[in-house]
Curated annotation (Swiss-Prot):
GO terms for biological process: L-histidine biosynthetic process. Gene3D superfamilies: Periplasmic binding protein-like II. It catalyses: 1-(5-phospho-beta-D-ribosyl)-ATP + diphosphate = 5-phospho-alpha-D-ribose 1-diphosphate + ATP. It is found in: Cytoplasm. It comes from Sulfurimonas denitrificans (strain ATCC 33889 / DSM 1251). This is ATP phosphoribosyltransferase. PROSITE patterns: ATP_P_PHORIBOSYLTR. The keyword ATP-binding applies. Keywords: Amino-acid biosynthesis, ATP-binding, Cytoplasm, Glycosyltransferase, Histidine biosynthesis, Nucleotide-binding, Transferase. InterPro entries: ATP_PRibTrfase_cat, ATP_PRibTrfase_CS, ATP_PRibTrfase_HisG, ATP_PRibTrfase_HisG_short. Belongs to the ATP phosphoribosyltransferase family. Short subfamily. It comes from the Bacteria. Signal peptide: none annotated.
Amino acid sequence: MLTVALPKGRIAQETLEIFETLFGDGFAFDDRKLILETPKFRFLLVRNQDVATYVFHQAADIGVVGLDTLEEQGLDVIRLLDLKRGICKVAIGMKKGEKFDLNKPEIKVASKMVNITKRYFEERAVSVDIIKLYGSIELAPLIGLADMIVDVVETGSTMKQNGLEVVEDIMTSSTYLIANKNSYIAKKDEVLDIYEKIKSVIDAEQKIK
């Protein structure tokens, strides 16, 4: 049996739909339950930020999580497959009309993704003061807390509604199937079997597009 960590919300639903396509059974969590047991799989419903942690510590054999979260956390897990879902960007946003100038002294950047932000500016040899926030990131430039933000952007509508605009894309993210390194060895046949099955679904979807 494989234990699968899924993030709560849309990604969990989309992933379970893939399993339904593959196995023909109904896969759905009972109301408020966090564990779904089937003959071949045990699904765990966890916070998005915790998926890779469950997989890294082998509380789950495999999991589904956004590439942005993987890059931010830097945990040593195997990235098996890009699921081509949950596509978004990590981008820099500023107040509309303001100039994106990395030569400006004492740049302040607000973000919940401190490590991605730090790497981006270090690669450009730019010294910045990173302010970690946990939500309502768009507020920071509006009240003078920060010059710019680094945040996940899907359509950009949230930034626009708050008088901000995207000035630079840092990375494109999508959901990934990941595996624990020990599980990949101990349960290699099972892991590779589900990998191949899911890959066939993703490949078929891409041909239709």
